[in-house]
Amino acid sequence: MLCTAVRVHAPEFADEAGIYKTAYLNHPCTQWARETRINYRFAVRLFKAMNDEYVWRFPRRSGGVVNTGHASMRHFDALVEAEKYIPDVSNFMTPHPQCFSGWDECKTDEEWPIVAYRAFYALDKMEFARYNKGRTMPTWMNPMPDWQERIYDEDSDS
């Protein structure tokens, strides 16, 4: 998404830097990232933080090789440099999109969708979430959603 933002605003730079080709051009988060420089800057910082978490969770790759980061990090320096090509039209981030179709009950009117994404993950992503290697489950992540409680309650009645 960041590479696409750069390709939209600075295709020559993108080609010279050898960053990924355009992908997800019309995805709401891709549009958001390229809308303003401050949005883009936040997305770059999030990209770095996500890579740091990835390295922390998986310090070794198969064969015992030290994990120095996701392969996409090879584009990080170019993405940082490319910030100057993103329109500097606001001192504030624009409202971040809430991209989880089929879960409208989770969406909020807030400009920053933390509450909405927490609800979405607690309702739909619980089955794959694992908290190990020193990470504890966030307090907002209900370990037993209401639907599971109802199933267990029904089982105990029979």
Predicted regions and their residues:
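Sequence termini and other peripheral, non-core segments
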Residues: 1-158
